[in-house]
Amino acid sequence: MSQSTSVLRRNGFTFKQFFVAHDRCAMKVGTDGILLGAWAPVAGVKRCLDIGAGSGLLALMLAQRTSDSVIIDAVELESEAATQAQENVAQSPWLERINVHTADIQQWVTQQTARFDLIISNPPYYEQGVECATPQREQARYTTSLDHQTLLTCAAECITEEGFFCVVLPEQIGNSFTELALSMGWHLRLRTDVAENEARLPHRVLLAFSPQAGECFSDRLVIRGPDQNYSEAYTALTQAFYLFM
């Protein structure tokens, strides 16, 4: 896919090595997903799982960041989104490495014998509240179809002993998610608090949990500098993906 043609495509987001159409997905490509896909630790991974794949963004980002031997499974409950994810994968350089499954993750994990050393999810985080325009968007935004305890349980069922389970969440919800994970036997190993600029409090948090205990490394990421341009740290993290960075 050449940049000269892909940059003109609509109803999606053009990255340096792939295009993500998202017009049939409830949740669109956004900063949260891009942060998570660029941040998740991939060193030494052999098999990855994307829970709630949506458009396939995270699976595609992981494919770009990992070697040709790494297999990625992407599970999406909503059929229209799963179909679009399959189409996005088919048009990418990594068709042979990414498997998109239209399935309920709770049922899907019970059928798996393989274990994953990296599991990634940009999960729903709102409790039932303001009505959404469509049932698909409600499913993507609210925890009614996949609450956080169920998500943590599903990840625990198919992760390797030294694997990482990575999520991105709003700051306060991330704190309660961490408390829940610790109570279920997970160990927090990586935490990055994300702020829009130096003057603002963090609004998102990137979290990596593991079944294996170990030191927790924490840091802070500022997206924009005083000049409102992307910060050096954010640029370093995401420049392999953004088309004009």
Curated annotation (Swiss-Prot):
Gene Ontology cellular component list: cytoplasm
InterPro entries: DNA_methylase_N6_adenine_CS, SAM-dependent_MTases_sf, Small_mtfrase_dom, tRNA_Adenine-N(6)_MTase, tRNA_adenine-N6_MeTrfase
Catalytic activity reported: adenosine(37) in tRNA1(Val) + S-adenosyl-L-methionine = N(6)-methyladenosine(37) in tRNA1(Val) + S-adenosyl-L-homocysteine + H(+)
Molecular function per GO: nucleic acid binding; tRNA (adenine-N6)-methyltransferase activity
Keywords, comma-separated and alphabetical: Cytoplasm, Methyltransferase, S-adenosyl-L-methionine, Transferase, tRNA processing
Keyword tRNA-binding part of the UniProt annotation: no
Localization in the cell: Cytoplasm
EC number(s) from the headed UniProt entry: 2.1.1.223
N-terminal signal peptide: none
Pfam families registered for this protein in UniProt: MTS
Spans traversing the lipid bilayer: none
Similarity section: Belongs to the methyltransferase superfamily. tRNA (adenine-N(6)-)-methyltransferase family.
Record NCBIfam families: tRm6a37MtseTrmN
Function: Specifically methylates the adenine in position 37 of tRNA(1)(Val) (anticodon cmo5UAC).
UniProt name for this protein: tRNA1(Val) (adenine(37)-N6)-methyltransferase
Protein source organism: Escherichia coli O157:H7
Taxon lineage: Bacteria, Pseudomonadati, Pseudomonadota, Gammaproteobacteria, Enterobacterales
